[in-house]
């Protein structure tokens, strides 16, 4: 199991956050940067009801050079995909290769959000 947002974290590893905890933090007004690494097609099927920075992994060559201008290092970043695998890889990359410190992976991705938080978000 991956480390949680409230537990200890191994060095150079992102944290995992549940859909419920992320929703609670957003509802409490925390300024969390949401990054969605899914493809355009997936975003058209289901999306969070919050503003997200869309960085599809398949098109990383288009956005990687501007990454530091798009993400603030002093605010937490929550990364999501469909089920949490691609977002975990991206979160690890942010921490290990780019030195971001407050990086969370949405456990279970948008599918978990649909199940745990908002059944109005379609599952696919």
Question: Across the structure, where does each feature detected by a protein language model lie?
Answer:
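Rhodanese-like catalytic fold shared by cysteine-dependent sulfurtransferases
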Residues: 2-33, 40-76, 85-124
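Short, surface-exposed ligand- or partner-binding patches at beta-edge/loop junctions that are enriched
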Residues: 80
């Amino acid at each position: 199991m991956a480390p949680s947002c409230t537990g200890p974290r191994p060095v150079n590893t992102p944290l995992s956050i549940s859909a419920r905890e992320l929703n609670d933090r957003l509802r409490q007004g925390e300024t969390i940067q949401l990054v969605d690494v899914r493809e355009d097609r997936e975003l058209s099927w289901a999306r969070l009801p919050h503003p997200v920075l869309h960085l599809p992994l398949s098109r990383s060559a288009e956005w990687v050079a501007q990454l530091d201008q798009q993400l603030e290092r002093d605010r937490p970043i929550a990364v999501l995909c469909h089920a949490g695998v691609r977002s975990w890889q991206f979160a690890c990359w942010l921490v290990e290769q780019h030195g971001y410190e407050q990086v969370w992976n949405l456990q279970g991705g948008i599918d978990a959000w649909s199940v745990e938080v908002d059944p109005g978000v379609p599952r696919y």
